Amino acid sequence: MQSKASTVQAYLRSLPADRRAAISAVRDVILKNLDPSYEEGMQYGMIGYYVPHSVYPKGYHCDPKQPLPFAMLASQKNYMSLYLMCVYGGGDDESAGSKHARWLREAWAKTGKKLDMGKSCIRFKKAEDLPLELIGEAVKRVPAASYIRAIEAALSTPRANGTRQSARNKAAAR
């Protein structure tokens, strides 16, 4: 569910008290562990943590007008989500995203808590479902400079079918 809120504070005020408490708990952990090169703000109707254009002028390859997204925090219809773009995909290759996804799954398993995870999102119903210290460590492990390097490497790596062309290059070709 995308919010129409224009600020993080407005977004938080729009949530029911139980969800506000859960989102705030996760937000506090993120902010405590976030590399100072990232910024917090509203992005795609969610609380976003991103690399601003002042640090990475190219922006998000899918929409260069947007800053490069790193993480998102959202209240959805049936659950809340933490999107960690640094674990997107999480395949078996040796990409930074795959390595970070493997680390996250292995570390999570050691906590004894159930992991409800999609390609890049961790779904939860309450903050107690999450090992908050692990969330903090996951955020801390990916400073903006290394995230940018991983994104650049992923965008320059050809796909198996040889058609790896970034959205930026496709847009320029039009």
Locations of the language-model features?
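Charge-dense, helix-prone N-terminal extensions
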Residues: 1-174
